[in-house]
Amino acid sequence: MQAKIKNKRVLVKFSGEALAGDNQFGIDIHVLDHIAKEIRSLVENDIEVGIVIGGGNIIRGVSAAQGGIIRRTSGDYMGMLATVINAVAMQEALEHIGLDTRVQSAIEIKEICESYIYRKAIRHLEKGRVVIFGAGTGNPFFTTDTAATLRAIEIGSDLIIKATKVDGIYDKDPNKFKDAKKLDTLSYNDALIGDIEVMDDTAISLAKDNKLPIVVCNMFKKGNLLQVIKHQQGVFSMVK
């Protein structure tokens, strides 16, 4: 992959399901530790890092509302709280290995974390702290992909990284189809109109309107995040 990326501030987004590891629910401590060490390698190379984590390892708002008992709005708020749980867990993992970390929530939970204030978030980043953004956008009906894109734009990230279990963007699910073809680069429009799953349309449209590159890469390959960001190498795909 030859696409050039030169940046100092990034936002890394990964799913809550990734935290569960091979389990279907909860947080795998080994996965948490691996991610923390990958983030540390970025900080040690003078990269300012913001993080958004999904909450699907605990609850998903859409799924919670399917039974008809829990309304979608309430289900989404439950999902936001799940992301705060994951954010606090990641904060603990990062601080355990020596990284100064702050959690900022879009919903006020002052006993646990700071409320989201973008100027304060930027100041934390400038001081070398990792900032984890919890509770999505603070509004129902918006995904954590959209929240991640929004936060990336607000804090002036050079790109948003969607860290996954695969090596990039494929024309179909590589876990199901052996003939899946990896796409190194993709336009915003192609990502919007095609059947290729990158992010939801709202997130991609936000990125397009603000010329924010989207990078999809494998977070489970040791050192890959740093290779992608710092050295313009590694295995990844880009939407731009």
From Swiss-Prot:
Disulfide bond annotation, renumbered to this chain: none
Gene Ontology biological process terms from the UniProt entry: 'de novo' CTP biosynthetic process; UDP biosynthetic process
Residues the entry annotates as binding ATP: K13, F14, S15, G16, G56, R60, T164, Y170, D173
Enzyme class: transferase
Pathway connected to this protein: Pyrimidine metabolism; CTP biosynthesis via de novo pathway; UDP from UMP (UMPK route): step 1/1
Pfam families: AA_kinase
Enzyme Commission identifier(s): 2.7.4.22
InterPro entries, sorted: AceGlu_kinase-like_sf, Asp/Glu/Uridylate_kinase, Uridylate_kinase, Uridylate_kinase_bac
Chemical reaction(s) catalysed: UMP + ATP = UDP + ADP
CDD domains: AAK_UMPK-PyrH-Ec
Name this polypeptide is given: Uridylate kinase
Natural source organism: Helicobacter pylori (strain J99 / ATCC 700824) (Campylobacter pylori J99)
Gene for this chain: pyrH
